[in-house]
């Protein structure tokens, strides 16, 4: 498993999803955050260490790694961030990771 290649594919999917959302809907003014959670057996496992190498960090929840910047959108719209995080998680899921998008309003 080449985690860097998977990350690059997922990040490209996230960027494309963010851009497509903005093109279709603009930037809704609902502020918030979105991220990707990946469930692992242990946060010091090989899988978790590989995820950490591409920017994931240990979550406050047990056996979970998360990534807060999935694409390259730097605005505040939660909807745009959710689109990117969802696309990123879908790519990881395709490669066998238990990945999900998380979000919360600001």
Question: Where do the PLM segments sit?
Answer:
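N-terminal leader/targeting segments
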Residues: 1-57
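Short, compact, well-ordered microdomains
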Residues: 68-106
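Short acidic, glycine/tyrosine-flanked loop/strand segments centered on an H-E-D-like triad
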Residues: 57-70
């Amino acid at each position: 498993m080449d985690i860097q290649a998977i990350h690059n594919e997922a990040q490209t999917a996230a960027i494309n999803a963010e851009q497509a959302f903005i093109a279709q809907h603009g930037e809704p003014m609902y502020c918030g955050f979105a991220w990707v959670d990946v469930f692992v057996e242990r946060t010091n496992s090989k899988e978790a260490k590989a995820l950490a190498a591409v920017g994931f960090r240990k979550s406050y929840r047990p056996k979970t790694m998360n990534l807060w910047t999935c694409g390259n959108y730097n605005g505040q719209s939660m909807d745009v961030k959710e689109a990117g995080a969802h696309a990123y998680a879908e790519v990881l899921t395709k490669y066998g990771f238990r990945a999900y998008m998380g979000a919360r309003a600001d």
